Design a protein with these regions (language model features):
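Glycine-rich, hydrophobic membrane-spanning regions of integral membrane proteins that mediate transport
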Residues: 2-454
Length: 454
């Protein structure tokens, strides 16, 4: 039984090929040596009788009449083949064992040709490893872990530099004036439950920005703007409850125009970004929904762990600091990839590593996956040895998740499909050459016939 599953057309093709193969095998072809010897004897006899064979050939061509050749339809070919060999023919049957092994070897070589294009060499792996090591070193030595001190939040040298930059860019006095002005007041900015109609667990001056979706740097542009337009406050409280309520006491903070609401949202972000309990990291508010887990000696849930991280200084500015190691990994890999491509002789415009399209840049996505996997593993070690969840590099884990998904999709779905297309393309190129040769042979053969197609 064949290991292949054939379509109806392929079954018909197999029957026709099997029948034609058997028909050719039944034809007795005299050896070319015998034929040449017979022709030579006939020409010698003609010359002995005073004839010139060359002239007889020219004479014969003048008197030769063209025969009629009828080409059957595909349906007729199939019917004839099925009468002789049936409908359950296997394509492998018309090949010898040696030919089948040769075919398998050819397919294996084509697969290997495709794999070589996407396989990383020592330089590719070295670039990815270097990026991972540099990113991990920056994360451990320069970003560090935020700690509350008498002088404010302090971390590694790089984290302190980023926080100082934000403080200089958004001076405390100016931000205080902005926060007290009407242009920055929003209806969702309640700091406790005094003005709420539905109690929000954990709502306080310390945690209100973590609980209110309007303060999320990403979700705020959806929920925050919507709350400004409707005069509401949308929260996910400490217990994981989603609450959306009208804030009657803050009705004067509403806006009726979406562009005015968007502008107010941006201004409010600006006024809050450098406060002692600043904006949370992007999407951090959603972790309040994760009311499960039994982590550490205190047996905390994931939501409680994240709430504690925010309290310890895991805010938007620290998120920006943590983004730098992940960015460094990206830059080193992409720059190294581009330099290597240029040295290999590729054009500069074809070496610019902006796209992750594997047909244009076969190895780039895999190199980025390896580099981010290494940097993420180092961060996991940092968290393990410090036993401090604030050491988690959130942007690095996001990058790792992104490239892991892409790599998994590539290995399981895209790579087999592209490899099959590559192999089929090569086979079709050879088939086109064979068909062109067959058509040329048929045209030459048909010169002496009147061809009729049914």
């Amino acid at each position: 039984m064949s290991k292949f599953k054939y379509t109806e057309f392929e079954k018909q093709m197999n029957s026709v090929l099997t029948h034609q193969d058997e028909a050719l095998a039944d034809i007795h072809f005299p050896s070319s040596d015998e034929t040449d010897a017979t022709i030579a004897k006939a020409e010698a006899l003609l010359r002995s009788l005073g004839y010139k064979p060359e002239l007889l050939k020219e004479l014969a061509s003048f008197h030769q009449l063209k025969k009629i050749m009828v080409v059957p339809t595909w349906k007729e070919l199939c019917a004839e083949a099925e009468r002789h060999v049936g409908t359950h023919c296997e394509l492998e049957s018309i090949f010898t064992e040696e030919e089948l092994r040769s075919n398998e070897l050819a397919i294996h070589q084509l697969n290997e040709e495709f794999n070589v294009v996407h396989r990383l060499d020592a330089f590719d792996i070295s670039i990815a490893a270097l990026a991972a090591l540099v990113g991990a070193a920056v994360d451990i030595l320069l970003v560090g872990i935020p700690n509350k001190t008498s002088g404010g939040l302090k971390g590694g040298p790089l984290a302190n530099y980023i926080r100082d930059y934000f403080d200089k860019k958004f001076p405390e006095e100016e931000m205080q004036k902005l926060a007290n002005s009407k242009v920055s007041k929003v209806p969702y900015d309640a700091q406790d439950n005094r003005h709420t109609t539905i109690r929000v667990e954990g709502l306080s001056a310390y945690y209100h920005r973590l609980l209110q979706l309007g303060h999320d740097p990403l979700l705020g542009f959806i929920f925050g703007v919507a709350d400004i337009l409707t005069g509401r406050m949308t929260t996910i409280d400490k217990a994981g409850n989603i609450v959306s309520q009208v804030m009657e006491n803050y009705a004067d903070r509403k806006e009726s125009d979406i562009f005015a609401a968007l502008a107010k949202q941006v201004i409010h972000f600006k006024s809050d970004v450098t406060t002692s309990m600043g904006l949370p990291a992007p999407l951090m508010s959603l972790f309040n929904l994760l009311q499960f887990g039994n982590i550490g000696e205190e047996e905390q849930t994931i939501a409680e762990i994240v709430q504690g991280m925010y309290y310890e200084g895991y805010d938007f500015i620290h998120f920006c600091s943590m983004s730098i190691p992940a960015m460094i990994v990206e830059v080193i890999v992409r720059l190294g990839y581009a330099i290597k491509r240029i040295k290999e002789g590729h054009a500069v415009k074809d070496s610019i590593p902006l796209s992750l399209n594997r047909e244009k840049h076969p190895k780039l996505a895999t190199m980025l996956f390896i580099a981010h996997a290494g940097a993420t593993a180092a961060n996991a070690g940092k968290v393990y040895f410090t036993q401090n969840p604030v050491a988690i590099n959130y942007p690095q884990w996001i990058a790792f998740a992104k490239y892991s998904y892409g790599q998994l999709k590539w290995v399981l779905l895209e790579k087999p499909t592209l490899r099959d297309a590559y192999v089929r393309g090569k086979i079709n190129e050879e088939l086109d050459a064979v068909l062109a040769e067959a058509n040329a042979s048929f045209d030459m053969f048909a010169e002496d016939y009147i061809v009729v197609f049914n």
